[in-house]
């Protein structure tokens, strides 16, 4: 998918999908995320069957689009690639917001996809009632509207509280 591994603080992973005339970098990032989630689901099933492991592995994913400043960090035995700025920070905060292996993208990213690419993605916001959850397809929400003003988690995401996002759940 033409992603480039980048240096990331903490226990997460970071990949950059760089804009190029020849590739569809945004859809590549989404495709990569969906394939990773599918592989993790398969790994979970295999471990349950083969090893009797009943814990679930999850990789929460946040994807954003924007312009950043790139650089390298020399470290033995190689050089590490890094970028700083709001785009990277928002993607990291989205992965913090995600739960149970979800993929969250910003409306900013979605709006830069072609009409054909948008039509191929299944996305939306999950609405929770008392005992069930429903995906309201083709919708976006601000983080603050999903966490509530008085929720303790709302303060954790204050810096991205007004960011419009949606959950990518698969292909159509």
Describe the residue ranges of each PLM region.
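A broad, structure-centric signal for solvent-exposed, well-ordered loop/edge residues
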Residues: 70, 77-80, 90-91, 112, ...
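Alpha-helix boundary/capping detector
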Residues: 39, 55-56, 89, 120-121
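Intrinsically disordered, glycine/charged-rich C-terminal tails and inter-domain linkers
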Residues: 100-172
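Conserved, well-folded catalytic cores of nucleic-acid-processing
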Residues: 39, 43-46, 76, 90, ...
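Catalytic/regulatory signature loops of cyclic-dinucleotide turnover enzymes
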Residues: 64-65, 86-108
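Serine endopeptidase catalytic core focused on the charge-relay Asp
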Residues: 36
């Amino acid at each position: 998918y033409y992603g480039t591994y980048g240096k990331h603080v903490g226990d997460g992973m970071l990949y950059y999908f760089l804009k190029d005339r020849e590739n569809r970098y945004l859809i590549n990032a989404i495709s990569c995320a969906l394939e990773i989630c599918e592989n993790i689901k398969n790994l979970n099933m295999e471990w349950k069957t083969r090893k009797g492991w009943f814990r679930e592995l999850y990789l929460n994913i946040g994807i954003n689009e924007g312009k950043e400043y790139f650089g390298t960090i020399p470290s033995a035995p190689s050089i590490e690639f890094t970028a700083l700025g709001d785009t990277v920070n928002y993607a990291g905060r989205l992965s913090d917001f995600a739960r149970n292996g979800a993929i969250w993208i910003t409306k900013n990213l979605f709006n830069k996809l072609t009409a054909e690419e948008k039509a191929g993605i299944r996305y939306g916001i999950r609405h929770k009632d008392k005992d069930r959850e429903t995906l309201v397809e083709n919708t976006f929400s601000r983080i603050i509207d999903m966490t509530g003003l008085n929720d303790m988690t709302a303060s954790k995401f204050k810096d991205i509280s007004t960011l419009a996002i949606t959950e990518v759940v698969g292909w159509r």
